[in-house]
Amino acid sequence: MLSIAVMCLNTTSKAQENADSKYTRNSIYMMKLDMAPENEEYKHAFEVMNKTFDGIDFAKRYERYNDFSLGNRHIDWTTIPEVTAAEMDAIEKESKKDQLLKSELEKLGVKVDPISEREYAARILKYFNENKYANQLVAKWHLSEGADPKNVTGWDEKLSVIMNLGLKGLSEEERANAIATENILQVCGDAENKLLSTTYVCVNNYRMMTAQEKTATAIALAQVALQFMPGPAKIAGQAAVTAAQVAAEKTKGYFVKTNAYLFKLDWDQSKFDGFYNNYWNKPDAFNTSANYQLKYVGKSSKSAGAGMTMKAAKVDELTARGALRATDAAFAALQRNYEEFRPMCSLHVEDGKLIAYIGKKESIKAGDKFNVFIPEEGKDKTIKWKQVGTIKVDKNGVWDNSEGAGQTIDGAAEDADDKDEVNTALKYTVFADKPSKKIGEGCMIRLAK
């Protein structure tokens, strides 16, 4: 990732640097759910996955987000509270598709997790809210760097964290004037609401699965989808089932599966007003009375190959690579599935082509469309983003920037689904459109709907 960052800096124009520097990023707190392995065969793999997760520098790996960690990144499953059926329904009601999928998996010989995805999400959410995670996130935004968000003794009157991450359009002089004239709350208001309302927590649950479990799941999903398709679409649906069955014959080994659950801070103007009316001058009251909440956004599930066997010579390296690839894929799926979570990234021009430093790691595919934006400064000095066009990823233009791209490791699992069309000669992703007066350096892009 460091080499990519350096390359970006070396090829970025002054105009582009200015655009990127004005972009207010979403904030993410990445966490891991610690659970016991399904069987003893996976015990060592779980240790490798845990070590791999702890070694991730999320500020670099997901550089288009603010790394907004509260410190501890682990949740012990044995400390997670139980939930009622009503609490699960509040997250997501069980559908006929869910029931059919469970039935199809059992028919195919797959051991179904007795804990449903909606139960995982509901229990994690209850854990967060019972342990005041939202309070800690709110506090972290308003405290000096390094202060304890669990025990607030006083707020940072300069609102340094919000100023640094949310007011990128202000000059140093304008920042100084805001502090000197005690006009900080007025200056920071809009930025504060945007930053806090786009503060997310992502919890990753890692499991191991065999090729048979992986392919059976794909077949079952295709079969369930087929049952809900209208007449004209059933031909395509049956083709999807057949494709999954064919892929099953070519998929071998063991895989890392990552289920990612996304939550966000529940924040709006009324929460902003309540914070300053009730707690700004009474930090002790915040410790005893504040009851901010996280809310559930959604989930994703992705897998990546590990070893052909669990005793391969390089099984640790293969498992670590699989964990990183699955983490990236699940994170990218959350972006694709939930528009509010999608980041912007810089658009560049190289050899007369529009390019961006995103690729397979971000699950970019040929034909993907991106909206193009330019920054505009409002009267209040806040930055607004104006859409000026749409561009499309070229047919042979996807860069393979996945973990360990181009590196062959002996003993790797075989994954028939890992057939994304990438151009191994590229060092960036190329768009089919050409630069124009409106679209080029100085623009930002975001995945379109």
What are these regions (language model features)?
Residues 9-15:
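Sec/Tat signal peptide C-region and signal peptidase I cleavage site
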Residues 16-449:
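Surface-exposed, polar/charged interaction patches used for macromolecular assembly or partner binding
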